[in-house]
Amino acid sequence: LLLVALAVLPAAATTAPELPAPVENALTFLLSAAPQGRPDPAPAALTPILDFVTANTLPAAKVRPANRAEGAGVYHKETFALPLRKLMGYMLDPAVPGEAIYPSAVRRNAWLPGSGILKDSGRFLTATLPPAAPLVTRGVEYEETTPDTSSGCYYSYKLNRLFVLTDYKGRAALFSVSAMPGQSSVGLRGAIVGDDKDWTYVYTSEKGTNLAMLGWAETYLYGSASVTVFIEDGTGRTEAHFFKWAKAGWKGSNVVKPSHITAGLRRFTSGLRLVRESPRCPSPQDIAARFAAFKGMDEATLRSRLRPFAAHLAGQDADPLDEKAFRA
């Protein structure tokens, strides 16, 4: 009887309200506009989303974007204690590696040759805010994730990326759009060493997961898409509004729930916040110079630099680091 009663409860009792149709249509359009060669979004196409994020008073958990081919959707909001220009200085400089500013989520990333952002980034970084006219650029990004907090899996994939910098009622707003054109590589086993907040991760080339009874599973990210709006709040801070969809699992099944996506966004933003809000954060130019220096080192020098870290890892015996795959 209890099961029957639960089954006939109105859908509104268990689901968040849908977004207004103009907002959904605008999100759909932006995701379709992400690949290079597509028409640039007109300012009017962005207005429904900007109207919504600046006027919405509902808690993020009470807002639910419609499901898409890329999976279930969530809405999430964060506020960063720094102006948009400073965020852009790190996010839109191709010389700054993603792993330096998103350490909790990105193992490594790179813009592929031919990406518009490789030649356009300077226009964004030096633009007057808000800009007199919208600025648009695109690119194709290669990305590898850090190990998942549950399964230990990490993935690699390509993303179509779209950036639009615009003026909204005298406030600068940056749209960051991503859409995965195909599924990811098969999930490989990694592990988090100690507390995830320490950003210490190890990686193997072994397929599978760290989950009990599911070590054999060959998992994939089947779909991923996002529309993020960064907008100045008028007090020197920047609001970030995330619309995110994801689908992942094995043998074609999807095991991702909205709560998993929200947890992933919180993990992503926690790393970004700690790096960017820290008074000790180096400038984009300093990070780029250090990264270039690392790339110029030979293998022997890199191994020497990493020897203390390797010794630290060798002293760890927590599961699953005692397994052969993590000791090679």
Residue ranges, per PLM feature:
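Bacterial N-terminal signal peptides
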Residues: 1-10
